[in-house]
Amino acid sequence: HQQDFVRRVGQDCIRYDIPFLLELLVYPLPNEAPDVVERHKSKFVLDSVREFAKPEYAVDLFKLESPVTDSELGDPDAKQASPVQQVFMEMGNLAGCPWVMLSAGTTAANFRRILKI
């Protein structure tokens, strides 16, 4: 259902020669515990980008939430930032087009840390 809708919007954007900006947000399904997204956030965000980056959706620009939780951030200048950086690099590679980062309700300090990574 959502994929068909996004596909139709992408085709309309092509038809009317307007850019398609798609904002992806992950939420738990109705039968899932609320913490399921937090535990698997990287996988869910990356899977969403992987799907909607396919040419059939015709997305020109993504608005994406961080693929990592605040608790995974650590110090962006420390060695442990490297695995987090890898997740961001994978997200960028999967997107295949420009993307901007959403704050996703995090604090200003944590958003700055995300941007530093």
Which positions does each model-derived feature cover?
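Active-site beta->alpha loop and helix N-cap motifs at the rims of alpha/beta catalytic domains
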Residues: 1-21, 29-30
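Generic structural signal for hydrophobic
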Residues: 6-9, 13, 52, 91, ...
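Short, well-ordered coil/turn segments that N-cap beta-strands
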Residues: 14-20, 57-60, 95-99
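Active-site glycine- and acidic-residue-rich loops that bind
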Residues: 2-4, 33-46, 72, 102-112
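Structural recognition of alpha->loop->beta junctions
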Residues: 37-64, 117
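Catalytic-face loop-and-helix region of soluble metabolic enzyme cores
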Residues: 61, 65-117
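Charged helix-capping and loop-helix junction motifs
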Residues: 2-6, 45, 80-87
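Active-site-proximal loop/short-helix segments
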Residues: 20-40, 64-72
